[in-house]
Swiss-Prot record:
Domain of life where this protein originates: Eukaryota
GO cellular component: cell division site; fungal-type vacuole lumen; growing cell tip; plasma membrane
Cytoplasmic side: 1-8, 113-129, 176-246
Protein name: pH-response regulator protein palI/RIM9
Subcellular location: Cell membrane
GO biological-process terms attached to the record: ascospore formation
Chain's role: Required for the proteolytic cleavage of the transcription factor RIM101 in response to alkaline ambient pH.
Length: 246
């Protein structure tokens, strides 16, 4: 696959991951139409919950406060579908953290695609390392959703789960791109060094002086490559130059 295509596909996949991970952040109570999980009339989101009775939203609260009177106003106890208490809701904080890491990775992917840093081995190595952390956080977000909401998980949560294999592909492509760019970089560096050494190791040797019939003097010089070591073979033919003087 051409490097240009790889960079373009990388930016597209990371953009899709950003969109997928943005939906859970917009769930209730920020948007009553988006639900991360539902159980016993409670609609859960990353930042809070709403209680809905017969399609009518009765109460919405940011944060999960198990000591609040409103929490137990409609049911005996506020529980997640997995029957865990709301005290474990602090695990949902991994969603905004994962989204932030993915956004930074998205910016890096755009820089790799649109600027000269796309051919910098150090920058691509940094992006590949960052992608590992972004992938692990996305995986942790999906596992937390499955742990809390089990079969009551709604489609925003499944989008997070779908972003996990996409993040794995992006991570793999970044390491592959880093390997290819590093190989090209060191090949060019080795070629430049070899070319410089080739001209730097030339030696002009005087071989002989001859006299012609008209008393002109012909001096023979040979331009040859000087080997780096005794074991190095000289494969290039010697170039002979003739100069004349009267």
């Amino acid at each position: 696959m051409h490097l240009f295509d790889l960079r373009t596909l990388l930016a597209i996949l990371v953009s899709i991951c950003v969109v997928f991970q943005a939906f859970p952040l917009a769930t209730v109570p920020l948007n009553k139409n988006l639900i991360l999980g539902q159980y016993m009339g409670y609609h859960f989101g990353v930042f809070g919950w709403c209680f809905v009775d017969k399609g009518v939203t009765i109460a919405c609260h940011c944060k999960f406060r198990p000591d609040s009177i409103e929490t137990y106003k409609y049911t005996d106890q506020l529980l997640f579908p997995s029957l865990y208490k709301v005290t474990i809701s602090t695990l949902l904080v991994v969603h905004p953290v994962s989204f932030a890491f993915t956004c930074i990775l998205w910016i890096m992917a755009l820089i790799i695609r649109l600027s000269r840093f796309g051919r910098c081995p150090i920058f691509i190595l940094s992006a590949a390392t960052w992608s590992l952390a972004a992938f692990l956080l996305a995986l942790l977000s999906a596992l937390v959703d499955l742990l809390l909401f089990v079969n009551k998980l709604k489609w925003p949560g499944w989008l997070v789960l779908a972003s996990v294999p996409l993040m794995a592909i992006c991570c793999s492509w970044l390491w592959s791109l880093r390997r290819q760019v590093s190989a090209i970089f060191y090949e060019r560096k080795a070629y430049a060094t070899q070319t410089y050494s080739r001209f730097d190791s030339m030696e002009l040797s005087h071989i002989d002086t001859k006299f012609s019939d008209d008393q002109s003097i012909y001096e023979t010089y040979t331009l040859e490559r000087v080997p780096y070591s005794k074991n190095e073979a000289i494969e290039e033919p010697a170039l002979t130059y003739y100069t004349s003087s009267s």
